[in-house]
Structures are given as structure tokens and as C-alpha cells.
């Protein structure tokens, strides 16, 4: 998949789910399932409910996202 195809959006983590998965509410009101990207997992970045995150969505499945950045 090319990097041009991704859609980046801001969101807020609502809850933790098993296997490093999170329920994220996007700024447009949609709720998606998000998983942590590999770089965040390697650097042990912790994500808690209430954190603001940047997610990447693909045009193929808009119900799932990849969490790529956690803002402070």
C-alpha cells in the first residue's frame, strides 16, 4: 500500500481492548478500532484512555485505523 492512500485524522482514545487494540473516537464523531503501529510498539509508547492520538485510515476499510502518534 502506498503512503498516498492513507487518511490521517485526529482522535481520542475511549477504551483499551485486548491485544494492543483501542477504541478511538475521531474528530468527526466516528468510532473506529485502532491498533498501535510497529514503531510505537518498539519504543514502548503507552496509550491510555483519554489520550489524543493521530490515526491513519485506509480507503479500503474505514472502521479500522493505525495509531501512529500520541500527543501530550
Swiss-Prot record:
Which GO terms fall under molecular function for this chain's record? ribosome binding; rRNA binding; translation initiation factor activity
One Pfam family recorded for the sequence: eIF-1a
S1-like domain segment(s): 1-72
Q: Where in the cell is it found?
A: Cytoplasm
Question: Per the database entry, which stretches of residues form a coiled coil?
Answer: none
InterPro entries according to UniProt: NA-bd_OB-fold (IPR012340), RNA-binding_domain_S1_IF1 (IPR006196), S1_domain (IPR003029), TIF_IF1 (IPR004368)
Q: What is its main location?
A: cytoplasm
Q: Which domain of life is it from?
A: Bacteria
| Gene Ontology cellular component list | cytosol
Q: Which UniProt key words apply to this protein?
A: Cytoplasm, Initiation factor, Protein biosynthesis, RNA-binding, rRNA-binding
Similarity comment text for this entry: Belongs to the IF-1 family.
Function text: One of the essential components for the initiation of protein synthesis. Stabilizes the binding of IF-2 and IF-3 on the 30S subunit to which N-formylmethionyl-tRNA(fMet) subsequently binds. Helps modulate mRNA selection, yielding the 30S pre-initiation complex (PIC). Upon addition of the 50S ribosomal subunit IF-1, IF-2 and IF-3 are released leaving the mature 70S translation initiation complex.
How does the annotation summarize its subunit structure?
Component of the 30S ribosomal translation pre-initiation complex which assembles on the 30S ribosome in the order IF-2 and IF-3, IF-1 and N-formylmethionyl-tRNA(fMet); mRNA recruitment can occur at any time during PIC assembly.
Q: Which PANTHER family does this entry report, sorted A to Z?
A: TRANSLATION INITIATION FACTOR IF-1, CHLOROPLASTIC
The protein's name: Translation initiation factor IF-1 2
Tell me the organism.
Cupriavidus metallidurans (strain ATCC 43123 / DSM 2839 / NBRC 102507 / CH34) (Ralstonia metallidurans)
Amino acid at each position: 500500500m502506498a503512503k498516498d492512500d492513507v487518511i490521517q485524522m485526529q482522535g481520542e482514545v475511549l477504551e483499551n481492548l485486548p491485544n494492543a487494540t483501542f477504541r478511538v473516537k475521531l474528530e468527526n464523531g466516528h468510532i473506529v478500532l485502532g491498533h498501535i503501529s510497529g514503531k510505537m510498539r518498539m519504543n514502548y509508547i503507552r496509550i491510555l484512555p483519554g489520550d489524543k492520538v493521530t490515526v491513519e485510515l485506509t480507503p479500503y476499510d474505514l472502521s479500522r485505523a493505525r495509531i501512529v502518534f500520541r500527543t501530550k
